[in-house]
């Protein structure tokens, strides 16, 4: 295989979770925090997560105070505790084949590490490393620190790894480390976002099978 290590996003790359967990939990929180404001549509939410990213959606656009951010995270935790999202079809079988070829599987996510391990616990896959939300702002996505740590910990060159993500903050994080990127285009996105991602990144795949054929062959 050309690549020794996968650096995986989780939400809407490995699992179908924005429409079932992250968006409804955000709307539930904002309905209490901003009851007089029109709720974001799903496309608007995805758009803001794309640019400027979820953290800045909370701080710069919604202008949540620290207590409001704590409340939003509390509601989010209630949803993530209650719902385990499903993996996209063929995703786990792709990882199994990659692992059989001695590949390294890592996850860099804005979800919490415990939710990543929970998602994978009923599969045959145990990630070799997970960098989640609780690592601290200067050590978590979209800061390039997790990618640098993966390269260092596993003694990899940038070209030995490839990052797979559905949104710009993660893809940009990899590009800053000269790590190749794949756009996970199998989760629905507004046309403007899809067009931008297809134009600005190394590889763009509409299905998990296309990704598997590229990585494994």
Task: Please provide the spans of the model-predicted regions.
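Short glycine/serine/threonine/alanine-rich loop segments
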Residues: 35, 64, 103, 156, ...
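Short, acidic loop-to-helix structural element flanking the phosphoryl-transfer center
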Residues: 79-107, 113, 144
